[in-house]
Amino acid sequence: MKVEKTVWNGKEGYLLQNESMEVFVNPEDGMNIYQMDWEGRQMIAWEEERYQRKATYGVPVLYPTPNRSEELKIQAFGRQYDARMHGLVKNRPFEVKAAEADGQTALVTGVLLWNEAQPDFPMFPFPSILSITVKALPDEVVWSYEVENCGEGEMSYGIAVHPYFNKREQAVKITVPAASVMEMTEEKIPTGKLIPAGETVPDLRTPALVDSLSLDHVYTDCQAGAHAEIFYNDC
């Protein structure tokens, strides 16, 4: 196991390595996982073109408003705030608090202080600390987070990751262990109303070809302990 600070594709960040995994994380760019290789296969591939045009790439962190909201507004504790799809932190710099390796694990932990020094604080005026850890294990990458409420009142938030897995020119299939899907408007705003999976969009509890799907939906009502899965021909 090894972790080192390095320059990769012209970007400074941290390379986590073991016998089967290589994971490059850039704390200065929202703790984004730029690339993830497993046994020589690029499972998440760096996309310079998307980076240059400021699109999403890698594994961006979406916090505190990961999804769309009606008229770009959210309601919280009796007040209305401006919102932004994909959140406010996906390109913000995180401070590295740990970068270490032992015989089983290589990891990097980054921390973002969300306070009045942040340019978008008025959009989410709740002082807090977001900590993210990316950990490389043998044949596994674990992404985890913690949110600490530093304010005096209540705080609510949403968080998600948006991984760009590489199809690698294969007939990739996916499963999602969700029994329901949220209804959404023509503008793709989730309404919160749940409908059975398969009624209007595919039921992904059985494998489906990615190339056959066109989805921008919220799948939910998941079986406890189950995971979404991606199936490659050579894995």
What is the predicted function of each stretch?
Residues M1-E4, F77-P138:
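Extended, loop-rich substrate-binding clefts of extracytoplasmic carbohydrate-active enzymes
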Residues Y14, Q104-V108, V141-W143, A228:
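Hydrophobic residues embedded in beta-strands of well-ordered beta-sheets
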Residues P27, W114-Y157, V161-R168:
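Acidic, contiguous internal or C-terminal segments within carbohydrate-active enzymes
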